[in-house]
UniProtKB/Swiss-Prot annotation:
Residues at the site labelled Transition state stabilizer: D499
GO biological process, one term: alpha-glucan biosynthetic process
Active site: D414, E443
Pathway recorded for this protein: Glycan biosynthesis; glycogen biosynthesis
Protein name listed in UniProt: Alpha-1,4-glucan:maltose-1-phosphate maltosyltransferase
Chain segments carrying region Disordered: 286-305
Record EC number: 2.4.99.16
Catalytic activity: alpha-maltose 1-phosphate + [(1->4)-alpha-D-glucosyl](n) = [(1->4)-alpha-D-glucosyl](n+2) + phosphate
Species in which this protein is naturally found: Mycolicibacterium smegmatis (strain ATCC 700084 / mc(2)155)
Organism classification: Bacteria, Bacillati, Actinomycetota, Actinomycetes, Mycobacteriales
Amino acid sequence: MRSGWVAGRIGIDDVAPVVSCGRYPAKAVVGEVVPVRATVWREGHDAVSATLVVRYLGTEFPRLASGPGTTPPAVPLGTVVQPGKRVKPQILQMSKGRTPDVFHGEFTPDAVGLWTFRVDGWGDPIATWRHAVEAKLEAGQSETELNNDLLVGARLLMRAAEGVPRKLRDPLLEAAQQLRTPGDPYQRAGGALSPEVADLLLQYPLREFVTRGEVHGVWVDRPLARFSSWYEMFPRSTGGWDENGHPVHGTFATAAAALPRIARMGFNVVYLPPIHPIGKVHRKGRNNSVTAAPGDVGSPWAIGSDEGGHDAVHPDLGTIDDFDAFVAAARDAGLEVALDLALQCAPDHPWAKEHPEWFTVLPDGTIAYAENPPKKYQDIYPLNFDNDPDGLFHEVLRVVKFWISHGVKVFRVDNPHTKPPNFWAWLIAEVKNEDPDILFLSEAFTRPARLYGLAKLGFTQSYTYFTWRTAKWELTEFGEEIAKYADHARPNLWVNTPDILHESLQHGGPGMFAIRAVLASTMSSSWGVYSGYELFEHRSVREGSEEYLDSEKYELRPRDFDGALARGESLEPFLTRLNEIRRLHPALRQLRTIKFHHLDNDALLAYSKFDPVTGDTVLVVVTLNPFGPEESTLWLDMEALGMEPYDRFWVRDEITGEEYQWGQSNYVRIEPAKAVAHVLNMPLIPYEKRLDLLRRE
C-alpha cells in the first residue's frame, strides 16, 4: 500500500492487471489487447461508473533495484508511473461486468515502453435518476407524484449539457425542456430516456464525486517478446565430416549455411549456446567424463581460457568479424540471433586470475568450484556477486553491451535463479534503458517463487515445467497456469534441451515427438526446439537419465538433415507446418484466452484459443498416446467459442486439410499413424462476444 493512501468518496478495489500490489509493471506487447478490471462501489442505491485513463510515458524501464557505486538509485514503481510532465491520456469508458460492481475496459498499446493506467470511479447521477424514474413509471405513479423527479432530471440534463460540445447539445436541451413541460409523465420523460440521449451521455457523462485510482504500470515489449519460435543449434557441430567420417569442427560460416533450413521450418529465433573460448583446466570429456581425451572439445558452458572470456569468440569458430557476418546472414534469413549469457567461468578464465574477488575463495586459498552435493563440477567456478558488486555488476553490463554492439538483441540467460535478484533487476533496467528492444529469456527450472519472481524483475520470457507435464490433468493445470500468470510471465515451451531428454521421448517413438511439438507450439505463444529433435534423437546415456547419449554438450554432433528428410525419417515437414499454422492464426499468439474442453478419455486433450482483435479461433484436439488410436466424445464449451448450444458449424483441420460439420458434442478419433492431433480452424467469434469472453471474471 502506498504511504498516504486514504479511502476515496468512491471505492476502487481489486484492480488488474497489477503485479505484486503494484511493485512491478505488468507485461504486454505492441498491438496486444490489455484487459483491465476493477471493483467500483459506493453507498446506497446510487449508480457508479468507471473510466480507464491510459498514458504512454516513453521508453525508460523502471529501476526496481539499486545498483552499485554511482548507479542511479532504485525508484518505487508507484513513483515512476506518475508522469513528470503533462502527457495527454486516453480516456476510455469502462463497462459493467457480470458480477455486480465489477467494471471492465481494454487498451491496446502501440509503442514499446512504459505505459500506465488508472481506474477512476465516479457517481453517475443521471443513471441513478433514470433507474428510479423508470421504476416509478412502471409502477404507474401519476404526474403529480413524479413531478419533482422529472424536474430533477431536467436540472441534471442541463448540467450535463455544459460538458457537451455546443453543436451536440440540442438533444439534451430538448429533453430537459420536455421534462419541464406539464403533461403525461411518459411523454415528459420520453426524451430523457431515449437511446439518443443515452448514447450522447455515454460519450459525455455527468460525473460526480470523481475518485482517482492508483496509477499502475505496464511494460510493453516488441511483438517477438510474446510470439516466437526458437531453434537451438551448436555452431561447432555444423562442419560435417572429413573423408574418413570424422566430425569436423564447424565455424560461423558453416553455421550460417545452416540458417536457410532453420528459416524454412518457420523458426524466427536461432539460439546459440556459449560461443566463447572453452576452459582447458579440468575440461570434461565425452558423456561428461571427468577426464578429457586429446581432441575433446569440452562443454561450451565452461567459459574462458587463455584465449579469452565472455567477450571473445572461440578461435575454432572464427573471429568476431565472422560472428558479425553470421548475425547478418541470420537477419537476411528472417532470424534473430539469441546468445547464451552464462555467468560462470572455467578455472582458466581471465577473471579467475585478474579478479579472484569475483569468486568464493576457500581457506586454503583456492577458488571454490561448483557443487550440487554429492556432485562436483571442477570445470566450473561460480561467481560471487557480494564481494565486489560494483566491479562485477559493471563488468557483466559491459559484456552484454559488447554483444549488443555486434547485433545481438536477445539473450538466453543460463540459470538466472542462482544469481541475486537485485543484480538482474539492475542489469535489465540498465540494458533496456539504452535499447528497449533487448529481450531476456530466463532458463530457470526452479521453484515457482524464483521462476515467477525473475519474470516480475524484467525477464521477457521464462522456461517452464512443461517438459515434465505429460498427463492430461498435469497439462490442463499447466495451461490454466499460463493464463493465470499472463500479466507478468510469458512461458517458452521447449520440447527438449541439450540437458533434458524426457523419458516420454526416450520411449514414445516418433509419435511422441509429434505430440510434444503440437502441445508446445499451441499451448503457449513461444516454443523451442533443440537441434536433433527433428531426427527423433532419443537415446539416453543410461536408463533413468535425462542426459543424451553422446551429448552434444561434450562433443561434435554433425547431422545429415537432408538425408533423413529424403528417407522420410524426419519431423521437419511437421515442424514446418506447425509454424505455418502459428503464423496463420493470431489465436495462437495468445496467452490469456486458453480454454479446455471436456473429453471422456484421459488419453485425449482439447483446448481452444481466440484472438481478441480478429476473433480468430483455434481448437486443438491432441492424443497423448503415440502408439494407437484413441476416441471419445468431445463436449465443447460453446460459450467459450462465442456460440449458442444449438449452433452447427464447419471446421477445417489445418494439419490434414479435412473439413467437418460439428456442434456442441462431437465424436473424435485420433490415429497417430495418420496425425497426432486436430488443429481446427473454428468460426470467427463476433466482436461483442469475444469482448465478453476476454472480460470473463
